[in-house]
Amino acid sequence: MSRHSLKVLAAAALAVCGTQSAMAQSAALIAAAKAEGQLTTIALPHDWCGYGAVIAGFKAKYGLKINELNPDAGSGDEIEAIKANKDNKGPQAPDVIDVGLSFGPSSKAAGLIQPYKVATWDSIPASAKDADGYWYGDYYGVMSFQVNTDLISKVPTDWADLLKPEYKNSVSLAGDPRVSSQAIQAVYAAGLSAAGGDASKAGAAGLKFFADMNKAGNFVPVIGKTASLAQGTTPIIISWDYNALAGRDTLKGNPKVQVVVPKSGVLAGVYVQAISAYAPHPNAAKLWMEYLYSDEGQLAWLNGYCHPIRFNDLAAKNKIPKAMMDKLPPAEGYAKAVFPTLDQQSAYKEVITKQWDTVVGANIAK
C-alpha cells in the first residue's frame, strides 16, 4: 500500500474517530443535562425573536423542564440576577443570559460568566465572539418604528419626525434606558441621526433628543408593548425590527401596523449568549447553548425575524428555506446599518444609563 493511501486511510480514520468522539460527547452532555433535570432562563419573552418556538423546540427535543424567570427583564436586570444569586442554587438563579453586546465583556471582567465553546464555534464570526468562549453573538436586528396606522395617519419615516406636534403622547421605548439594552440602543440610534452619524457625539445627542421629545409631550414614559400599541396608549414604539415584526404578526391586522426602518441613524444591534459562572445547572446550560447554535436553533430565531449570527454560514450551505427569506423586510432598508464597536457601545452605554435621569428626567413605568 502506498504512503498516499495510508495517509488517506489515516485521515479517514481520524475523521470517523472525531465524529464518534463528538457523538459520545453529545450523548454524555445530554445525559448530564437530564440528570440536572431543568434549565433556568431569564428575560426571554415568547414573542421576542421567536423564543416561544425556541423554548418549545428545546423541551420537545430533550424533555427538560425550563424555569422561566422575569420575561420582561432588561440586560442589566439579568446581570443583577446573577450577582444576587451567587450563593443560591435555587429557582431564582439563572443558568444562562441573553444580553446586549456591551454586557458580554463587562460580565466576563466581573467574573459572572464561564467559558464554553459550542460545536459550531468556528462558524460564528470572530468579531462577534470572545476568543476564549465566555460570550458570543446570537442574533442581530436594526432599530425600527412600530406604528399603529389605525391611529397614526402620517407614518414617521425618520427620527426627526418624532418631534413633530402630530405625534403628541404617541412615542414610547420598548424598555427602560437605564437598564434595557434595547432602549439604550434606541437612544443611541436617535443620537446617531441627530449628530449626523458622529458616533462620539451620539450618546449625548440621543439624550438631548429624548429630552426635547419629553418636553414637547410626545414621549410616553411607559414600556411599549404589543398590547399598549393596540390599545393606543403607545401608538408608536421604538424597538428592534424583529420585535416589531413579530408584534405586527400577532395583531393580524387589528389594528394595522407598519414597521419602519428610519432613513438615518440605522443602528444594528447584536445580542450575546453566556452561561452564568454560578449556574445551578451547568450541563443543561451547555446543552441549551448547543441547541441555540445548531442549524435548528438558528433557523428558529430567523423564523422570529432575527438574523442569527450564523446567517451567512447557513445561507452559504443553502440551509435557509425560501419561504423564511421571503418573510424578511426588504434588504435595502438594512443597507445603511451601522454596527457600533464594543468600545463605542461601552462609551454610550455609560453616558445614557448614568445621565438619563438628569438630562431627560422621565421615569419609565413598567
Question: What is each of the regions a protein language model found here?
Answer:
Residues 267, 271, 276-337:
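Mature extracytoplasmic/periplasmic domains
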Residues 1-23:
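Gram-negative bacterial Sec-dependent N-terminal signal peptides
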Residues 140-143, 207-212, 252-279:
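Periplasmic-binding protein-like
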Residues 227, 332-366:
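Conserved C-terminal helix/tail region of periplasmic/extracytoplasmic solute-binding proteins
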Residues 23-40, 59-61, 164-166, 366:
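Immediate post-signal peptide segment of exported/extracytoplasmic ligand-binding proteins
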Residues 104-106, 230, 235-255:
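A ligand-binding cleft/hinge motif common to bilobed small-molecule-binding domains
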Residues 35-39, 61-65, 88-90, 283-284:
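Short, surface-exposed connector motifs at secondary-structure boundaries
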Residues 42-56, 67-83, 90-233:
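Extracytoplasmic ligand-binding site segments that recognize negatively charged/polar headgroups
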